[in-house]
Amino acid sequence: RIYLLHSTLNDYLEQLLCLLYENMMNDAQTGNITGHNTIASALTNIVTGKEDANFSSPNGKYNFFTCSSNTLKCDEYAFNASSILIAGNGEFNVKHYTGKFNAYQRTYVLIPDLEYYALLYLASMYQIKSFKSAASGSIVKFITKGDIENIPVFIPDNKAILNKFNCLLMLQEQYQKESDELASIRDWLLPML
């Protein structure tokens, strides 16, 4: 039950983040808030993971992000930061994670200053959704580094907005870590019944 509660809370937080982001973007378009436009490459370096899919290990200690929506495990980490992960092919999903992890070679890793962490995650998520819907009916094989570098990002002058986004995203990550720990304990205990 606690696991389901955490999952429900995470879904709710994701919806809340999206709603607040859409509201901010609407306010920006109507002139109700001020700020400036930039692109992802102005906020962070963009790199890819170096590992192939065989790098995963079922009992690994660290998360291994691939182009799948499912997160695998591995034995070695290459990154240790609050990061945005964008699948360069396959499902074209966008994830966020704070901690030690590794990434597949077609997964883009963005590590912005913490001030812009949630904002860049939301901008990336909406741009990738837009990219997928614009390509509807045609085959999109991959997303390029240039596509990622040019993700548009609106930065509001009111820093309280950024703080709100970051607090909600960090809360979501905390619930996810607790859910993962509970699932691990459940999986360890079930065979003992």
Where are these regions (language model features)?
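Non-catalytic DNA-recognition/assembly elements of restriction-modification systems
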Residues: 1-68, 157-193
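DNA target-recognition domains and sequence-specific DNA-contacting regions of bacterial/archaeal
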Residues: 35-156
